[in-house]
């Protein structure tokens, strides 16, 4: 990750595709407390990665069905199957997006109407999912969801 990424710096060099504040040719001081930064989100994502064995490798990524082309939905499972993480990302930075989606119950050997537990790893909320067909809403203020799914 480049320095400044967590500050959401995105001003382009006029007439080019590179960032104006890239450290490519300079080292510059930055105000890491500036409004609009995503430092807390990056720190939380790193904690989630460390705490979940499914995220300890780049291998095993699977794409799943979400019936909205503006939502990317995928998951990873630990090698022993004990840790299952699902991620959904809103690709539209300006609008909330909603979709029905499938929980991949078949990967856990469960019937389509099985009961599973979900946990939002960004905010700690927990709930019970019933069946494989579910619904999600992702908005620009929190454009992604990271969920741990368990059977007990």
Where do the language-model regions lie?
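Carbohydrate-interacting/catalytic domains
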Residues: 1, 5-152
């Amino acid at each position: 990750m480049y320095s400044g990424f967590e500050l959401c710096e995105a001003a382009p060099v006029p007439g080019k595709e590179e960032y104006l504040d890239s450290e490519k040719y300079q080292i510059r001081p930055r105000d890491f407390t500036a409004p609009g930064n995503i430092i807390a989100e990056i720190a939380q994502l790193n904690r989630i990665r460390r705490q979940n064995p499914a995220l300890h490798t780049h291998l095993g990524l699977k794409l799943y069905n979400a019936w909205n082309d503006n939502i990317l939905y995928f998951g990873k499972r630990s090698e022993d199957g004990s840790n299952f993480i699902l991620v959904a990302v809103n690709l539209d930075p300006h609008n909330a997006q909603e979709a029905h989606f499938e929980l991949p119950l078949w990967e856990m050997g469960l019937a389509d109407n099985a009961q599973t537990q979900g946990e939002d790893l960004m905010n700690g909320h927990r709930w019970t999912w019933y069946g494989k067909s579910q619904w999600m809403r992702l908005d620009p203020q929190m454009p992604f969801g990271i969920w741990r799914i368990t059977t007990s």
